């Protein structure tokens, strides 16, 4: 069945005054095409828009789709032949053409053939051209602003006398309206001595009425407009000689209403004028205030302001008014570039239909509106430019954002709070969803705060300080994440969260507009527009609280953020050798690491520089290097100012060294003060003013060879076409033995724990029985010195008759990280080789780490099945037939054999068994060989050490 289109709908819409339509016509889509913008800049990318040709079966009219309807075109729901019903639309005159802007529609039927033979409809109001020879001096502009709509004597220029055709005006709340005296759009005119004011029936407009008092006949010849002459219907605006009081409604589709009148060049009869479209209108702030005809006072238009929804805002509406609640407001920020500087702030708006949009104020507008805008209040906002939203910083569901102008825009607070407008609109995401989200994504979060860290002060890249505080958030998804609070959030809200967590209660917190990052795994941080509410009153909050109290508090949780140690932010702990070995800093982003090292050398030729002490508009110090003018004054090129006393700041270059190597690093003022404990100006005065070289040298020497924790920024930089790795110390603190011990113990605990959280080593690991001398497995690190009966792997030492090597012979020798002995490295240690051989032959794993326990992975010997020792130290019979190849007896290895070997392993010097020639206590027959190993500890038998470097 062929659908029924609304007859005459296109003509009715086209002849309707600018503004929202009052009918809901059924039309057919004849064509759909994307809107292409010529000479558009490559960035920012304009929002994608589509235009349609709509038909009522007889006439067609161009239309523009709201961006919210773009998905209907992309999924082919809207295509040629589709029959739709327009439920919300408006009609405006754009560049001399009537355009229907479709806000909402219903799709009634698809795949219909084109009904009838429709032709393009040209509105009668656009068929007449204004006389181009009309001089501007004969007209006067009027900036009458009313809350009614299209002006009955709208903006016009007096037409030629022969123009007698009747024309309807097209006023409205969304663009420059035309009134009863025609249009002056695009025509620049000079103010005249008299003016005719006008009112209409739609939203607040600025009607540009143009007429000339010289062209008007004397009062006796002039037809006086009154309520009878201007009221074809009961709903039409009325005008009296003394008052102008428009009614609240205008019959929108009656072409006979709101006729325009103008004074001809001669005579006193009003006639319909012509219009001139397609030229830019003169800004309203350049127009003089309205001057009414001398016929008595004119009353204020008290009709209600026409409000449009936020979703209907688009750049094609020069005049609009929205009613919305401020849901968020940013702090005022200072900015500067090479061309200008100023202030800026933004705020988010939400209306009763759920539409959201962001408004920005720059420079003078920021100073004017910042004090007026309050979060939670409802405002009427009119006039402002709409620009494409920068989605990198603005994630509201709108393609545009408002820029308020100090001369055009108006912001009026509503005295009564409109309860139909929600206070905030959330789109909560679960923490588990953040794992696969891209960085810089803006999200809303709701979760339980499980822990709060103390606040800390850090230095920004621009040189200013800011505060940060980290909290852990947990939700129903069984995931947790670290959220960083920045700036003012650390004080009020952060302190409140800290107190509640310390008291045992876990508050629930809602974030609006937090940003996802990849620091420390996955994390979330606040930004300038983020909103934070503690224990909000949402239905989701109660459900989350009940879950946490019943099961969530004790339920296992997976953290998306890497765990932090107890020393605040801990960047990866690295050695100096690892900087080169792991190619740190070679990628696009710098690497942030922490190095434990000592300062071995400080370059003192230029350890500081004179800096500009002036404050920049952004609130931080300039710090640019100042130049001495030679007359006692210093000059800054950036600030272009001269001053008498510069501020000296550190610019250090020094060498740091640890047990793996050394490298050069740089440090600026903050890190330099942490190293020397005094300002650069004091050190400069000691050396250059007091010329006390001895004290200066003492200060420099005082910082050498002390252990520090250096927080380094490692980045590859290019200088003179050469790439080099640069290490910059951004924070330096002296090593605290207590804190460092906690860090090391935590690292050891992580090594000792298997994935189930249970240690493979004995409970007394690392301790020796002082009575019996029996050893248990220990967790001592590779640099521990063993002087008791066991080494760091729990190996029982052999005690045998023999003399120890003198202490002097062990100086400056290497310390083995496996057996703890001196004189060799771990790579050639026979203990490690024997361990690998035994456990591989017995079906066990090699001892590559602390968790690799012989054979079966338990803490007992796999040979005798008894705890307290490893298989390599088993005193009982081995099940694998591992016996000493010298004496053929089980219970020990050849390196610990106390009897003479059958292979004739005797000292060739003294011809006595039990030791090798290198360990011979007697006189050597030849040149004395240097001894190897460290036999100071009596518990270490010489036979063990005799194996070093031999077999």
Curated annotation (Swiss-Prot):
The record's listing under SMART domains reads: ZnF_C2HC
State a single Gene Ontology molecular function.
damaged DNA binding
Query: Which Gene Ontology terms of cellular component type are present?
Result: DNA replication factor A complex
The residues that cross the membrane are none
Concerning its family, UniProt says:
Belongs to the replication factor A protein 1 family.
Q: What does this protein do?
A: Component of the replication protein A complex (RPA) required for DNA recombination, repair and replication. The activity of RPA is mediated by single-stranded DNA binding and protein interactions. Probably involved in repair of double-strand DNA breaks (DSBs) induced by genotoxic stresses.
Name of the protein in question: Replication protein A 70 kDa DNA-binding subunit C
- State the organism of origin: Oryza sativa subsp. japonica
Gene name in the database record: RPA1C
């Amino acid at each position: 069945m062929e659908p029924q289109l609304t007859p005459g709908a296109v003509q009715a819409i086209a002849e309707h005054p600018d503004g929202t339509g009052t009918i809901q016509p059924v039309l057919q889509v004849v064509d759909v095409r994307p809107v292409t913008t010529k000479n558009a800049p490559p960035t920012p990318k304009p929002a994608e828009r589509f235009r349609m040709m709509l038909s009522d079966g007889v006439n067609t009219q161009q239309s523009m789709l709201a961006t919210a309807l773009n998905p209907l075109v992309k999924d082919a729901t809207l295509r040629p032949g589709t029959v739709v019903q327009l439920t919300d639309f408006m009609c405006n005159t754009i560049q001399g053409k009537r355009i229907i802007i479709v806000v909402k529609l219903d799709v009634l039927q698809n795949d219909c053939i084109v009904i009838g033979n429709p032709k393009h409809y040209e509105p009668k109001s656009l068929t007449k051209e204004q006389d181009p020879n009309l001089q501007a001096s004969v007209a006067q502009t009027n900036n009458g602003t009313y809350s009614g709509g299209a002006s009955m004597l709208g903006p016009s220029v007096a037409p030629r006398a022969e123009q007698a055709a009747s024309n309807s005006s097209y006023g409205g709340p969304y663009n420059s309206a035309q009134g009863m005296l025609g249009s002056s759009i695009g025509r620049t005119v000079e103010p005249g001595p008299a003016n005719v004011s006008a009112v209409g029936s739609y939203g607040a407009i600025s009607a540009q009425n143009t007429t000339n008092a010289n062209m008007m006949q004397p009062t006796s010849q002039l037809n006086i407009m009154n309520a009878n002459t201007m009221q074809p219907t009961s709903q039409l605006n009325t005008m009296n000689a003394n008052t102008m009081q428009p009614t609240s409604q205008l019959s929108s589709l009656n072409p006979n209403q709101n006729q325009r009148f103008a004074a001809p060049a001669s005579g006193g009869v009003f006639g319909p004028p012509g219009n001139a479209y397609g030229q830019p209108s003169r800004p309203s702030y350049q127009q003089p205030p309205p001057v009414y005809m001398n016929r008595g006072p004119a009353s204020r238009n008290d009709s209600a302001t026409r409000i449009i929804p936020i979703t209907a805002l688009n750049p094609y509406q020069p005049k609009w008014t929205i009613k919305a609640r401020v849901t968020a407001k940013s702090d005022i920020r200072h900015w500067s570039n090479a061309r200008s500087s100023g202030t800026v702030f933004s705020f988010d708006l939400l209306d009763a239909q759920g539409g959201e949009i962001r408004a920005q104020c720059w420079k003078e507008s920021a100073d004017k509106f910042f004090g007026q805008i309050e979060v939670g209040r409802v405002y009427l906002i009119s006039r402002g430019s709409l620009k494409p939203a920068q989605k990198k910083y603005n994630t509201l569901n709108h393609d545009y954002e408002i820029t308020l102008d100090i001369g055009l825009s108006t912001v009026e607070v509503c005295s009564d709070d409109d309860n139909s407008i929600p206070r905030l609109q959330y789109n909560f995401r679960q923490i588990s969803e953040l794992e696969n989200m891209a960085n810089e994504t803006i999200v809303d979060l709701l979760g339980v705060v499980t822990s709060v860290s103390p606040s800390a002060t850090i230095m920004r890249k621009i040189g200013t300080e800011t505060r940060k505080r980290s909290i852990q958030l947990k939700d129903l998804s069984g995931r947790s994440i670290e959220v960083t609070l920045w700036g003012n959030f650390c004080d009020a809200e952060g302190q409140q969260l800290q107190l509640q967590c310390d008291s045992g209660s876990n508050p629930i917190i809602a974030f609006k507009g937090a940003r996802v990052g990849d620091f420390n795994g996955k994390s979330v941080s606040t930004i300038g527009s983020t909103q934070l509410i503690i224990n909000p009153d949402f239905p989701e909050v109660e459900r989350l609280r009940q879950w946490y109290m019943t099961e969530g508090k004790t339920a296992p949780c997976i953290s998306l953020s890497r765990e932090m140690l107890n020393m605040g932010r801990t960047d990866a702990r690295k050695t100096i050798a690892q900087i080169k070995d792991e190619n740190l800093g070679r990628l696009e982003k710098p690497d942030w690491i922490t190095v434990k090292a000592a300062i071995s050398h400080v370059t003192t030729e230029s350890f500081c520089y004179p800096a500009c002490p002036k404050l920049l508009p952004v609130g931080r110090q300039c710090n640019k290097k100042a130049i001495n003018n030679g007359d006692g004054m210093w000059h800054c090129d950036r600030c272009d100012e001269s001053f008498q006393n510069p501020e000296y700041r550190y610019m250090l270059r020094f060498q740091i060294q640890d047990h793996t190597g050394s490298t050069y690093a740089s440090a600026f003022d903050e890190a330099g003060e942490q190293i020397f404990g005094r300002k650069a100006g004091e050190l400069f005065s000691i050396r250059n003013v007091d010329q006390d070289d001895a004290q200066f040298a003492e200060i420099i020497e005082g910082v050498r060879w002390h252990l520090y924790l250096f927080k380094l920024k490692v980045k590859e930089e290019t200088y003179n076409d050469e790439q080099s790795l640069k290490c910059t110390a951004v924070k330096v603190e002296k090593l605290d033995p207590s804190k460092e011990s906690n860090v090391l113990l935590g690292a050891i605990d992580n090594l000792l724990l298997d994935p189930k959280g249970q240690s493979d080593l004995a409970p007394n690991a690392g301790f020796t029985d002082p009575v019996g001398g029996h050893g248990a497995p220990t967790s001592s690190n590779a640099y521990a010195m063993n002087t008791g009966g066991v080494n760091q792997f729990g190996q029982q030492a052999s005690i045998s008759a023999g003399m120890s090597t003198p202490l002097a012979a062990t100086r400056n020798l290497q310390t083995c990280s496996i057996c703890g002995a001196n004189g060799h490295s771990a790579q050639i240690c026979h203990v490690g080789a024997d361990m690998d051989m035994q456990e591989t032959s017995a079906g066990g794993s090699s001892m590559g780490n602390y968790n690799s326990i012989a054979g079966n992975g338990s803490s007992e010997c796999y040979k005798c099945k008894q705890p307290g020792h490893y298989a390599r130290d088993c005193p009982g019979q081995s099940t694998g037939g591992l016996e000493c190849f010298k004496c053929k007896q089980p219970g020990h290895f050849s390196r610990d054999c106390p009897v003479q070997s059958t292979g004739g392993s005797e000292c060739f010097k003294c011809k006595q068994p039990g030791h090798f020639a290198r360990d011979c206590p007697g006189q050597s027959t030849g040149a004395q060989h240097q001894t190897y190993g460290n036999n100071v500890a009596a518990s270490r038998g010489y036979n063990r050490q005799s194996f070093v470097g031999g077999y």
